[in-house]
Swiss-Prot record:
Biological process terms in GO annotation: glycine decarboxylation via glycine cleavage system
Family membership: Belongs to the GcvT family.
Gene responsible for this protein: gcvT
Species per Swiss-Prot/TrEMBL record: Sodalis glossinidius (strain morsitans)
Keyword presence, Transferase: yes
GO MF annotations, alphabetized: aminomethyltransferase activity; transaminase activity
Lineage, highest ranks first: Bacteria, Pseudomonadati, Pseudomonadota, Gammaproteobacteria, Enterobacterales
EC number(s) stated in the UniProt entry for this protein: 2.1.2.10
HAMAP family in the cross-refs: GcvT
Protein's recorded name: Aminomethyltransferase
Catalyzed chemical reaction(s): N(6)-[(R)-S(8)-aminomethyldihydrolipoyl]-L-lysyl-[protein] + (6S)-5,6,7,8-tetrahydrofolate = N(6)-[(R)-dihydrolipoyl]-L-lysyl-[protein] + (6R)-5,10-methylene-5,6,7,8-tetrahydrofolate + NH4(+)
Alphabetized UniProt keyword annotations: Aminotransferase, Transferase
Length: 366
């Protein structure tokens, strides 16, 4: 039977259409996915993301452990609260998961990992933590609420105590702070400013209702997916998985190669891929005619040598903000500015862009 988050009854009270999402009953929408999408781009919306897994790590060698476990380097994290995005790789360089890691103190770090990969992530982390004597604690006692949009921070702050407002004052993106019972982070999955707030599960429903009263509209998984696609953000299981290299998933920027002596898991395989060159890459596609780009559709183009090449759409949808169809696609190296997508046996032209279409509500790719 599918699990329920602490906000399950709140979703029903707001008329949500519920679906089973990787073993969790989650809201798909509350009546209109399109309205919810625009709500986040233009004002503020909130998402129940309590199905995500929060993992706390503790011990004197936690930093050393994470420098081995993760492709990005936590040596960059020198200011308490600072976070970074990274892949957690297997020995062959495939992506076990993408996650956010927060530096809390020299002996405490926090990870936020995906729900779909929870069991294998926790097993992998725990197994590799043992030689470092790092304590691994899965925080099932916490709920997680994302408040996103241009008005997200101002409206959410009306619910904060004076101490909490002071704690987040001037906080830059990709930081987190514990302020009383709330862990408030300036992160998100929409391309908009906002907060992701972890709080005791027993307090989640009350906080959700306070956000509703403050004018924050609930939004479901449908809008969350089109928002992240417009922002060019990866979805695990589509843009990457254990058989896909981060170099083929627009995650090359999350790999810290120096110092060369840092022996992170997957490094040897990635170095071989990098040396070989000409691997696959993730690109953006924008539809120039009517039609909708869908996951799994083939992408064709002719390379500089005149050879026909084929890739695949990993995520595709209509973009409510741009009014056209957009997609992320994994393709062989050498693609130009135009390609062809086969839709119902029709060859449809698409424009090739960088993987990212909307930032802070504005078009960056058309």
């Amino acid at each position: 039977m599918a699990q329920q988050t602490p906000l399950y009854e709140e979703h029903h009270a707001s008329g949500a259409k519920m679906v089973d999402f990787h073993g969790w009953m989650m809201p798909l929408h509350y009546g209109s996915q399109l309205d919810e999408h625009h709500q986040v781009r233009r004002d503020v919306g909130m998402f129940d993301v309590s199905h995500m897994t929060i993992v706390d790590l503790a011990g004197p060698r936690t930093r050393d452990f994470l420098r081995h476990l993760l492709a990005n380097d936590v040596a960059k994290l020198t200011v308490p609260g600072k976070a970074l995005y990274t892949g957690m790789l297997n020995a062959s360089g495939g992506v076990i998961d993408d996650l956010i890691v927060y530096f809390l103190s020299e002996i405490e770090f926090r990870l936020v990992v995906n729900s779909e990969t929870r069991d294998k992530d926790v097993e992998w982390i725990t197994r590799h933590a043992e030689p470092y004597q790092v304590t691994v604690t899965v925080r099932d006692d916490l709920a997680l609420i994302a408040v996103q949009g241009p008005q997200a921070q101002s409206k959410t702050q009306t619910l904060f105590s004076s101490q909490q407002r002071q704690a987040v004052s001037g906080m830059k993106p990709f930081f987190g702070v514990q302020a009383n019972e709330l862990f408030i982070a300036t992160t998100g999955y929409t391309g908009e400013a906002g907060y992701e707030i972890a709080l005791p599960a027993t307090q989640a429903a009350d906080f959700w209702r306070q956000l509703l009263a403050a004018g924050v509209k609930p939004c479901g998984l449908g809008a969350r997916d089109t928002l992240r696609l417009e922002a060019g953000m990866n979805l695990y299981g589509q843009e990457m998985d254990e058989g896909i290299s981060p170099l083929a998933a627009n995650m090359g920027w999350t790999i810290t190669w120096r110092p060369e002596g840092r022996d992170f898991i997957g490094r040897e395989a990635l170095e071989a891929q990098r040396a070989a060159g000409d691997g696959e890459q993730l690109v953006g596609l924008v539809m120039t005619e009517k039609g909708v780009l869908r996951n799994g559709l083939p992408v064709h183009f002719t390379d500089a040598a005149g050879n026909m090449q084929q890739g695949i759409i990993t995520s595709g949808s209509f973009s409510p903000t741009l009014g056209v169809s957009i997609a992320l696609a994994r393709v062989p190296a050498g693609i130009g500015q135009q390609a062809i997508v086969l839709i119902r046996n029709r060859e449809m032209p698409v424009k090739v862009t960088k993987p990212g279409f909307v930032r802070a509500g504005k078009a960056v790719a058309q």
